[in-house]
Amino acid sequence: SVSGVASKYAIANEYDKMMTAMGAQGTNAFTSFEKTVYTDDVPANALNKYITVQAERFRNPVLRIFHTELEAVYEEKNRSLDSDNSEVFETLFASLFKKHNYGLQTTIGTVEHLKNPSLKEIRKYFHTYYVPNNMAVVLSGDFNPDEAIAEIDKAFSYMTPKAVPQYTFEKEEPITAP
């Protein structure tokens, strides 16, 4: 399998080790309805190095550890299947948004989606939506903002804006009763 071949080249915890080496903490990511967020707490003296790493990550993602990430997502999905809170949340959104993706599918997808992921479709999604006019960089802390913006502009200058497909959906019927 592709995952089996890729695992031969995977470097365990490569990204986390790189972040730790520059003093970063709190490395994490999450996806919600309208966004995917990557977070790190980075020392100000490592900001330029961090920006360079992030720019390279988005230039041409290496998906050699995709199989292990998928396993983590699959586990998260399995936990949600056993969670009353998740069931209430999904039922609520399915009831409120009968014609919108908020109610038609969960952010994480279905078990079937996770069983048969297409790297081709993942790359297509990445190249469609991970474009500069659909992204934001948010920084806070003890650094010179003008220097940081200049460094971000330089590091991400290879990216070119392009049209992002507009999501369209049918108007929901008014809720007239509890």
Go through each PLM region and give its residues.
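Generic, well-ordered alpha-helical scaffold segments in large soluble proteins
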Residues: 53, 57, 76, 95, ...
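Acidic/histidine-enriched alpha-helical segments
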Residues: 62-78, 144, 163-177
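Hydrophobic face of alpha-helices
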Residues: 12, 51, 67-70, 89, ...
